[in-house]
Amino acid sequence: MLARALIRRRQAVTTLAAPSRARSTRSRALLDELGAGAVAAEGVGRARGSSKNAFVRATTANGNETLASAGDGGSTSSASSSSTTSGGIMVSAAHPSSHPQVLAVPLPRRPLMPGIIMPVKVTDEKLIAELEDMRNRGQAYVGAFLMRSEGSSSSSAAGKEEDAFDALTKRTVASVGLDGEEEEGADPSDHMHDIGTFAQVHNIVRLPADSPNGEESATLLLLGHRRLRKLGTMKRDPLVVQVEHLKDEKFDANDDIIKATTNEVVATIKDLLKTNPLHKETLQYFAQNFNDFQDPPKLADLGASMCSADDAQLQRVLELLSVKDRLDATLELLKKEVEIGKLQADIGKKVEDKISGDQRRYFLMEQLKSIKKELGMERDDKTALIEKFTKRFEPKRKSVPEETVKVIDEELQKLSGLEPSSSEFNVTRNYLEWLTSLPWGVCGDEKLDIAHAQEVLDADHYGLEDVKDRILEFIAVGQLLGTTQGKIITMVGPPGVGKTSIGQSIAKALGRKFYRFSVGGMSDVAEIKGHRRTYVGAMPGKLIQCLKSTGVCNPVVLIDEIDKLGRGYQGDPASALLELLDPEQNGTFLDHYLDVPVDLSKVLFVCTANVLDTIPGPLLDRMEVVRLSGYITDEKVQIARTYLEKAAKGKSGLSDFDATITDEAMSKLIGDYCREAGVRNLQKHLEKVYRKVALKVARAKSTDTTLDPIVIDVDDLVDYVGQPPFQTDRIYDETPPGVVTGLAWTAMGGSTLYIECTSVESGEGKGSLKTTGQLGDVMKESSAIAHTFTRGFLQSKDPGNDFLQKTSLHVHVPAGATPKDGPSAGVTITTSLLSLAMDKPVKPNLAMTGELTLTGRVLPVGGIKEKTIAARRSGVKTIIFPQGNKKDYDELSEDIREGLEACFVSTYDEVYRHALDWDR
Ligand code: ADP
């Protein structure tokens, strides 16, 4: 394509037949445009003595003739006359014979290819003067030689080639001396390559002396004509060398290989043009003015001049007189150039892609912003944020404490001055997000209606009268006062008795929002009091989160498992809770994150715990404790029938299906499978039963059989829930001497336990006592007290019985997995020792509890209700309680006490009578 275009262009030029003026003006313009770049120009103008010879193609079909034809008639006079006619670049090739010696111009980089125009900087003042002188006399011709690179130079001048060049010119000046006489020494022309280019000086432009040492310099515009070999130095300062003008070796223009190589060079130049537009101009110019595409040696020179190869490679091309070799070398350089060009284009494209991608995104974002603004959809982020916060905060402004208002205003101010991408902006934004979304005195509506509350509470829970009463009282006080204050109610009881679920019902009864969190195992104070804002990812504590999520300042907050509060290295969460739960302090609760006081005094706190022992004293002091003991069988039946069964059926998708559990089966389920204090296990068992029923129903449905109503009786239970688990609380049907049933109160509720005593060995002075069964310190002390007391007591009851003095005893409390501690086993241990010593079993179905002093007094203990329930569960008929617990027992409801005989004692003597002396 390109070749064709070029040919067309050439034809056009020929037909226009404007060889001289028109072309020269255009070429000058192009030259100006290309500036300092190497410009291809026809190497040799055909002089023929004509004054209009500028830019006339010089070559014939055979390149060999170039020199001869270029040479004829070329003279300084004709050249100078032509310069006056055209005013453009003069191309006139002086005959070799007229230039056996030439001024040597050193080229710091890139050799000058014949046919090419190249600017060269010269700093040698004498050389410049001489050149100017020559030009004034007519045409100036020089020999341009590439400086040898450092490695190949005989000069010791180090550094860059330009430095070498400077050094050379200086040395040349120095070595010539003042009188101009030649001095012995190295040939100054050694620093140049031997093969150079015979060149015409077109222009000499003096440059202002800007170098620090004030050296003169000038730029020469050289047009290469033909190859030269330097033979020797004729004169120094300026350097004049003897030269031999070289001709290209003869070649056969019709040789296939030459043709093919030539074509390939043209094709490669074409390729090169695709990637490098600068070359395009060069070539266009070349093609417009000359027709060298059929002239292989010229083409090779042109191709080489287009390459960015290093000086050595270009010099090699210059030195090759064999046309074929030169074409090959050029082709190699061109191919490399094309590769580099591709790589360059690739890199350029990548960079461009990236830049344009980024720019595109930027423009699109800007556009989006302005579109949004235009449509009023969104103000810019910051303004929108500030507006949001202000809008949220304004309605509350009046109820917010003054100092908090100040903080919020300051923060809003700060936010407006911050850069949205800064981290500070985010911190402030989050802080404002919290500050503005807290309720700040906004209370939720409250239902202070006793009847309604009673209804709601009863609807969800059976029994639990203490808790329900407490809530009703709370409402009553609120009604009378016209306002409610926060309270802290703590429910203590075994698992599964409904502590958590009634918390929820309380909120429902009062019409308040509900929030629950568990502090079991919590060891980090920050969970309650928040992190300081300086921490990355800082958050307020649970209470502030609660206020935000409920949006009111008077929710019911259930703090679960308060007895299992952890204690970590990050401070003591119990103390933090203290601040929260102390009615004196929680009006101005200070969260670390929020840093402004928050009023929590309207919050109704409900805490749950299994035991009270582990709740820190000061915390316990601020709570109202409501005890929930476990349920007896009748209560469980009630709960199961009214609440759990319905829920379990519903969960299994059996609400509409007729499936029932008979009363007997229910009693067995409760009595044999779910004997613990709470009803969670019962709930699980009922769910299990109904899941199995659901499977049956689903199977029947899939086979399209109609199913009769399912009735689950005692015998079916094994199918539904398996065999009843082994019950450890009744090991003995009848207790042997030395074994007594005690009553204990643990985190799981009340339970019966056996205290076993047996003799290990006997002998004079062997009386001792050993205890096992996970007993704590208090219980071990109780054993020691019991042992001492029993010795004395036995003497009074059975004088002469020296069993205790002579026998080493072992007391054990089975159920070794459960840690047991507390003083309430005192009377039980004593009784077991006595029973063994007297070899007399205690009254059947008897259980006892009570602390014993060394003098035999029986002191009251805790957990009477739990113990009573546990005793009943284990089939105990008679219980011995300390006299001090009579009031507790009397408070128990009738159904718990039903069928039980309670004996109240204040001294051990009475215990003895009930337990060991009962049959008298
Ligand atoms: P806790 O918090 O005491 O361990 P939960 O409150 O989780 O126990 O109660 C366990 C389950 O037993 C809940 O589904 C609850 O509804 C049920 N439950 C407990 N006590 C009663 C009750 N008195 N009446 C009705 N359901 C109860």
Swiss-Prot record:
It is found in: Mitochondrion matrix. It comes from the Eukaryota. Transmembrane segments: none annotated. Keywords: ATP-binding, DNA-binding, Hydrolase, Mitochondrion, Nucleotide-binding, Protease, Serine protease, Transit peptide. Pfam families: AAA, Lon_C, Lon_lid, LON_substr_bdg. Residues 102-338 form the Lon N-terminal domain. SUPFAM superfamilies: P-loop containing nucleoside triphosphate hydrolases, PUA domain-like, Ribosomal protein S5 domain 2-like. Residues 75-88 have a biased composition (Low complexity). Residues 734-918 form the Lon proteolytic domain. One of its GO terms (cellular component) is mitochondrial matrix. Residues 1-58 form a transit peptide. Its EC number is 3.4.21.53. GO terms for biological process: cellular response to oxidative stress; chaperone-mediated protein complex assembly; mitochondrion organization; oxidation-dependent protein catabolic process; protein quality control for misfolded or incompletely synthesized proteins. It catalyses: Hydrolysis of proteins in presence of ATP. The active site is at 824, 867. GO terms for molecular function: ATP binding; ATP hydrolysis activity; ATP-dependent peptidase activity; sequence-specific DNA binding; serine-type endopeptidase activity; single-stranded DNA binding. PROSITE patterns: LON_N, LON_PROTEOLYTIC, LON_SER. It is an enzyme of class 3 (hydrolase). Residues 65-94 are annotated as: Disordered. Homohexamer or homoheptamer. Organized in a ring with a central cavity. Belongs to the peptidase S16 family. HAMAP family: lonm_euk. ATP-dependent serine protease that mediates the selective degradation of misfolded, unassembled or oxidatively damaged polypeptides as well as certain short-lived regulatory proteins in the mitochondrial matrix. May also have a chaperone function in the assembly of inner membrane protein complexes. Participates in the regulation of mitochondrial gene expression and in the maintenance of the integrity of the mitochondrial genome. Binds to mitochondrial DNA in a site-specific manner. This is Lon protease homolog, mitochondrial. It comes from Ostreococcus tauri.
